[in-house]
């Protein structure tokens, strides 16, 4: 008999941060707000989250298109995960959902936090908008080593 993994999974919680065109919080802080809301809405605790997924992963180019990745959010929430996926290899925004379904079906994890961060409007209002890092400015986060190659 054919087994359909998507029928054995469910979206149990949803969270959303404040939305603005000039955010007073960082992209990571907004993502943390939404993640905590989703975890609470699902009736879970941070300790019960054992997977994390996003698309397309963290981009350190200053555009705000995808400013937060799995590693940054995992660290901010102090999550201990067995599985994560946060790359642009998936076929679009729903790629993170399908990756999570596969991970749950494979028994790699049970409760996956899926998120998508966008900060484009705020990024356009900053000195970083649509530019590479200027001399003297520091890049932070897990992709700091890649900044010279963007």
Name what the model sees in each region.
Residues 45-51:
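Short acidic capping loops at alpha-helix termini that bridge into adjacent secondary structure
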Residues 1-28, 37, 137-138:
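Condensing-enzyme catalytic core mediating Claisen C-C bond formation in acyl metabolism
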Residues 13-15, 49, 78-80:
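A short alpha-helix capping/helix-coil boundary motif
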Residues 52-57:
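Acidic helix-start/capping segments at beta-turn-to-alpha-helix junctions
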Residues 28-43, 69:
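Short, well-ordered amphipathic alpha-helical segments that serve as non-catalytic structural scaffolds
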Residues 3-9, 59-150:
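Conserved catalytic cysteine-centered active-site region
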Residues 1-2, 42-44:
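Generic secretory/membrane-interface signal
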């Amino acid at each position: 008999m054919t087994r359909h993994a998507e029928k054995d999974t469910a979206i149990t919680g949803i969270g959303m941060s404040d939305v603005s065109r000039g955010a007073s919080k960082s992209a990571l802080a907004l993502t943390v707000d939404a993640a905590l809301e989703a975890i609470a809405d699902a009736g879970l605790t941070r300790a019960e989250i054992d997977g994390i997924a996003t698309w397309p992963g963290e981009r350190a180019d200053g555009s705000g298109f995808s400013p937060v990745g799995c590693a940054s959010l995992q660290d901010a929430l102090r999550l201990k995960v067995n599985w994560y996926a946060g790359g642009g290899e998936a076929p679009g925004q729903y790629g993170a959902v399908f990756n999570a379904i596969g991970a749950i079906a494979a028994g790699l994890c049970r409760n996956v936090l899926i998120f998508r961060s966008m900060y484009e409007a705020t990024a356009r209002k900053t000195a970083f908008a649509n530019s590479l890092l200027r001399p003297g400015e520091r890049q932070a986060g897990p992709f700091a080593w890649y900044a010279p190659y963007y």
